[in-house]
Amino acid sequence: MERERLVLKVTALQACIRGFLVRRQFQSLRGEYEAIVQEIEGDLGTLQWTEGWIPRPRFLPKKAKSCQTWKATGERAPNPEQELWSRFACKETEKETIREDMILKKSGESFTNASSLPCRDASAWSQDEQSRRTGKPSQETRDVSRKNDPEAAGPGLFHSQTELQELQNHRSHLAMELLWLQQAINSRKEYLVLKQTLRSPEVNQNRHEPSLCQEHGGQSCEKAGSQPGPPLEDQPYRGRTPGEPGHVDASCWRLRSQAHKFPEGLATPDKITAGAKYRDPSYRWPGPQLPTLSEYQATGKRLTKELDCGEEISGETCLQLTTLLEDESHKELKSKGSCPGKARTQLPTLHKDPNIEDNSPRGPCPKELDWQRAVPQELGVSEDHVTWDGSLAEHGGLDLWKNKPPKGQTPSDKSSIERSPSESSHEGWQNQRAVPFRSRPPEKLSTGSGHTGEDHWRGRQWKTGPAG
């Protein structure tokens, strides 16, 4: 029992202590709240606390505030007549405000000022009459005296006017800062736009500025520079200085750039297949052969080096180049020696069909004009300024060989070089077996300058069987 009593006493003491602490905390909060309201509003006339264990703040309207101020002044008055007069004035002001609110609700927004002025005049006239009868000042006289003497109106109104002036100054200051910030942003934008417009013409001018050739007297070579040029091995003049000779004109340059694509456009599919066939060592027959692909490449490279030393090429020099190539090929043929009789007699025979007669022996090919026309075209020679390209040297060996027609075609010329000894004149190419085939080399690779030691090939027939 004693323990229970002790516990009850302790809990009661703790409750008292907690209540004291809570009340003191609420008082401190109330003081802070009132300080904030006074700092904002200037006075605590509109603030009112509710009654109860936990008081709550409540703000009164401004009209009630005026009544409260009159009550405060009436309390200060020493005689009861002033207290009654203050109450009567508060009632009059309340009635007047209610009447004005009713009039404003009934009338429109456009007639608010016109409708409120007569009512105010009537109320002022009634107040004047009453003041004359009672000998007391009216509301307007009190308002005028309050404006003239701010100290009589109380310290709250004076503080509110000063704070209002400060707020107006702060507002104007903020407006000026915002205006300055906007102007700074606009000026920065204009500067960036101007900077971009000044840079763009310089870039375009540098990109489209034509390059000038010193050899052509300042003539612009913009067109030639914009076109895709040949690779580095076809342009040995790139490493030269501008003072060295060897600049070709624009037409030569364009033809050199087009010479890259020349073998692809010139060689037909038949020629390509024929060249691949003759490149294959399994298709080679014993006997005299034309220079190989590597020999043509070496000759083309040597000619390219000679031509790149600065000489411009004309039509006559092109013909001289072709004759030089032909002479070299003839020398190589002579070095290898003419085809002996034993080699000719040991040529592999074609498989013959017993039902087909051999009525078309191989005859000589007298078409020198065709070879004279074909050589300049296959070597890439034209009447304009043309340079010998290394790529043409690679493909030149392929183009000099005449290809075998496909199986489905019937040859139109009986004296063609491609015919085999075993083909028939009436059956065509269909019954012939596919045998590796080597065409006879051309009799003459010249341009009409003269016969150069290859006449022993002309007029001789190819022997297909063994000697005996």
Swiss-Prot record:
Region named Disordered: 113-157, 202-245, 329-468
All copies of domain IQ, residue ranges: 6-35
Record-linked InterPro entries: IQCC
Protein's recorded name: IQ domain-containing protein C
Gene name in the database record: IQCC
Organism: Bos taurus (Bovine)
Basic and acidic residues biased stretches: 139-150, 415-426
